[in-house]
Amino acid sequence: MKQYLELCQRIVDDGVWIENKRTNKRCLTVVNADLTFDVANNQFPLITTRKSFWKSAIAELLGYIRGYDNAADFRALGTKTWDMNANDNLAWLNNPHRKGEDDMGRVYGVQGRSWQKPDGSTIDQLRKIVDNLSEGIDDRGEILTFYNPGEFDLGCLRPCMHTHTFSLLGDTLHLTSYQRSCDVPLGLNFNQVQVYTLLALVAQITGKKPGLAYHKIINAHIYEDQLSLLRDVQLTRTPFAAPKLIINPKIKCLEDLETWVTMDDFDVIGYEHHEAIKYPFSV
């Protein structure tokens, strides 16, 4: 929590007001933020200064792992995070590539599991990474990226947290995740849970020990309609100790994540938190 709160305070104190054309709102903004999560010692980075709905964040990550491209599939997993971007984003609603209600297009997990090649075939980036790591191989290119500028017009949203690089040192697996843009009051709560959980899951299914997860954010911002709640409410609260994430040990391989795993296979213990805060969401 300390590094999260320090980032929030840094934005409040040092941020610059930037007009965001997509949302027609101003954002208090800083550039370059680095967070580190201790997965080895199960220090789960769940926000305690407000109630956090961690299951929705992990459900979204599971949808990415499965390569889902439809908001209905995410809802079936237990998260509504894609409903607004799929169905209320005016630019996407007017996009001729949109296939209909709940369609997200070629975003996030679609790119991670089915990156289009010029010859019409596809690359399964995640499969390659898992196969290599399972064999103890780190080719210095164990990279999962969702950032495909050539297909931005085929999806409802450019990826915010866009690239994950796995590094194997001995039998310990580390992760570095890159995020171009972060809505700190709302998005970071989800994003840091996903960075942590992605390393924990990939380490588990490849038989490696989890190490550290490094979360690198380029543009960290607070929307103008979120500022008072963050500054005058959340930042006045005393944080609690970090909880622990429990993952079903029966999850052994990528196919398990693709097929039978549900939110019932995850639990959080020792989670103390303050009351929820309803921050505005900008589409």
UniProtKB/Swiss-Prot annotation:
The active site is at C160 (nucleophile). Pathway: Pyrimidine metabolism; dTTP biosynthesis. Its EC number is 2.1.1.45. CDD domains: TS_Pyrimidine_HMase. Keywords: Cytoplasm, Methyltransferase, Nucleotide biosynthesis, Transferase. It catalyses: dUMP + (6R)-5,10-methylene-5,6,7,8-tetrahydrofolate = 7,8-dihydrofolate + dTMP. Its main location: cytoplasm. One of its GO terms (molecular function) is thymidylate synthase activity. (6R)-5,10-methylene-5,6,7,8-tetrahydrofolate binds at D183, S282. Disulfide bonds: none annotated. It comes from the Bacteria. Pfam families: Thymidylat_synt. It is found in: Cytoplasm. InterPro entries: Thymidate_synth/dCMP_Mease, Thymidate_synth/dCMP_Mease_dom, Thymidate_synth/dCMP_Mease_sf, Thymidylate_synthase, Thymidylate_synthase_AS. The keyword Methyltransferase applies. GO terms for cellular component: cytosol. Catalyzes the reductive methylation of 2'-deoxyuridine-5'-monophosphate (dUMP) to 2'-deoxythymidine-5'-monophosphate (dTMP) while utilizing 5,10-methylenetetrahydrofolate (mTHF) as the methyl donor and reductant in the reaction, yielding dihydrofolate (DHF) as a by-product. This enzymatic reaction provides an intracellular de novo source of dTMP, an essential precursor for DNA biosynthesis. Homodimer. Belongs to the thymidylate synthase family. Bacterial-type ThyA subfamily. This is Thymidylate synthase.
